[in-house]
């Protein structure tokens, strides 16, 4: 159960795909985060081609009582979606709800993430195939 101090939420934001199976790793990531952080609401949103949309996910989090949302873009690099689309979605959601938003950097901006990916690639490539 969430603590009474829970007013913040985490919104994982990914691109989306017309292939429903594409979302499976993101659903697993959401579950892993929820298991580690039981004091925040966690939701998943997609830019296009699959639900929930950014606006739909924000509405879900607002209904749960969130007044602050940290957006975690699940993009390896900063491109047009992070430079243009995401800020526009956040501004529209803020105007509609009054919720305060904070955006984490793209995954590739994290040295820790780059090291984790590098370690995984080396380890996976060394396995007998």
Describe each model-derived feature in a short phrase:
Residues 1-129:
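Active-site-proximal alpha-helix that buttresses catalytic centers in soluble enzyme cores
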């Amino acid at each position: 159960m969430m603590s009474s101090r829970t007013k913040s939420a985490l919104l994982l934001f990914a691109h989306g795909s017309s292939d429903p199976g594409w979302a499976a790793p993101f659903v697993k990531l959401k579950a892993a985060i929820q298991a580690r952080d039981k004091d925040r609401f966690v939701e998943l949103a997609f830019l296009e081609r699959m639900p929930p949309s950014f606006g739909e996910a924000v509405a879900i989090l607002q209904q749960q009582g969130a007044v602050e949302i940290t957006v975690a873009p699940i993009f390896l690099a900063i491109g047009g979606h992070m430079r243009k689309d995401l800020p526009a979605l956040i501004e529209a959601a803020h105007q509609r709800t009054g919720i305060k938003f904070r955006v984490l950097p793209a995954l590739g901006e994290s040295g820790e993430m780059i090291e984790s990916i590098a370690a995984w690639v080396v380890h996976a490539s060394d396995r007998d195939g």
